[in-house]
Amino acid sequence: MNQINNMKNTLYSLFLLLLSILPAYASGDKPTIKSLLKELDRTIAMKADFHKQREHEIDSIRKLAHATPSPEEKYHLYSSLYGIYLHYQADSALHYLEKRKALLPSLQNPQYENDLWIARAEVLGIMGLYNEVAAQLEQVRRDQLDNQTLLYYYYTCRTYYGWIADYTRTDERHKYIEKTNAYRDSILSLTTNQLDHSVVLADKMIVEGQADKAIELIDKELAGLDNQESLVYLLYNLSQAYAQKGDTEKQIYYLAQTAIADLKTAKREYISLQKLALLMFEKGDIERAYKYLSCSMEDAVACNARLRSVEVTEFFPIVDKVYKLKIEKEKQISRTLLISVSFLSF
């Protein structure tokens, strides 16, 4: 009973954290870009605190897993640890995947075996091991999957082919885009949750060049939304829709909110902050661009998220060079002013 209560307390803490991520929407007050960027700066400065909170949650679940004699309970607790580590520290997610696998002989549940193949593909994708992702997905027995696991399989396939399409420069890119679109449609055909359906449908609309329709759909969902986790996905989709429309200010507005949410939930594998960094650079805010990219690189390396590391390194050297030139220029101005003041004092 104590173990169950402890688990409830841990989950309740996670729930409270999610509720605190984007309080502006909960209260109905919309923040300004200026206030959001200031909050993002504070959030980056407090990143270590959010990581400590995450480690505390991990430690609580790990203790429960160690204490329970039930293989079934251990399996589900290891699944929770896998989920927490997935976008935080991919190597550790893989470690708890192996612990789940070790329990399979005592559980005798073929559904779990398929679930592990999909989960392994998911984490290997984050680590950038795409050849291995394909090999894992080929092992899945789709005829054995219930609807929930089949949906998980579709999401993983859609993400995998999306990654491949983004980083393929050959004639095969179109083939991967078609596969990405096909799996997105499969998700839409199977999803029963209205909010999840809207998130995926908005993504589809944006891909098909229907930004205005996507914005209209998302705005309807935001009107009465109380699911903070889904809110993050909707806001990111809004940023993409406004990017398609060429509205940079709105893109910054929504990327800032998703970046804050990513950092407050101790995610290290993310895309919003580096996209925001590039926009800051284009607007001439070199200091923020440098800060955001440095944070993104640090987190990607700590998570072992190779794709995100590659994304950052594509334009970090340019930002780094401009930032250092800016600092040097400021030093030169300071030295000139100091000399001038010293001269006038005589």
What role is predicted for each listed range?
Residues 324-346:
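Alpha-helical transmembrane signal-anchor helices
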Residues 4, 12-14, 23-331:
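A "functional boundary" signal
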